[in-house]
């Protein structure tokens, strides 16, 4: 969904700490993540872009929990937390009660190993713009999963121009969270 937890749009930066373990395991600083609408979010178009972001940091769950910048993303600080796996002394994690994910999601969430931080992100919402087919970046077979593509500098510049030209969601119905387009 685009409920605000995956990714989490709250300041100081957009973060992806839950769901999408494959992306979180592989992404590196400088990578672009494009998120397409799922069937529940937008049943009419599987190629609409809900959000996009450029990875600026890759943190472990322990680093994320201990980083003061992200205290505001813990369960007692927001309605849509994503910072709810507290490190334990045996190198594991203790799930913290939250309204987003139950304890049954812990293996999937922490299996992604990393938390991605995006200082530069675009939020388009559930009915975001359709990614032009000629970019060659659409999900081909289904709406689930992930795929990687290497872009040349001209391809990336063209995509960035397109992303910057799209209207952003600035206020969501779940509160006054604003997009973090910088």
Tell where the protein language model's regions lie, with residue ranges.
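Structured loops at beta-to-helix junctions and adjacent beta-edge loops in soluble globular domains
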Residues: 1, 36, 56, 121, ...
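Short N-terminal edge-element motif at the start of the domain
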Residues: 1-45
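Eukaryotic short linear interaction motifs
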Residues: 42-43, 58-63
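A generic structural signal for short, solvent-exposed coil/turn residues
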Residues: 45-47, 116
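Short beta-strand-centered aromatic/proline hotspots
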Residues: 47-58
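Contiguous surface segments at macromolecular interaction interfaces
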Residues: 61-182
């Amino acid at each position: 969904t685009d409920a605000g937890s995956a990714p989490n749009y709250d300041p100081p930066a957009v973060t992806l700490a839950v769901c999408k373990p494959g992306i979180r395991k592989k992404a590196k600083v400088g990578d672009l993540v494009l998120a397409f609408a799922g069937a529940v979010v937008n049943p009419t178009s599987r190629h609409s872009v809900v959000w996009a972001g450029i990875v600026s940091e890759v943190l472990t769950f322990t680093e994320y929990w201990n980083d003061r910048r992200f205290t505001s993303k813990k369960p007692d600080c927001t309605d849509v937390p994503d910072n709810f796996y507290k490190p334990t002394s045996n190198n594991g994690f203790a799930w913290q009660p939250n309204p987003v994910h139950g304890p049954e999601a812990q293996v999937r969430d922490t299996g992604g190993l990393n938390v991605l931080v995006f200082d530069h992100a675009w939020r388009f919402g559930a009915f975001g713009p359709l990614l032009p087919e000629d970019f060659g970046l659409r999900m081909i077979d289904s709406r689930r999963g992930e795929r990687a593509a290497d872009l040349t500098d001209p391809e990336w510049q063209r995509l960035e121009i397109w992303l910057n030209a799209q209207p952003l969601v600035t206020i969501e119905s779940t509160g006054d969270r604003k997009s973090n387009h910088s």
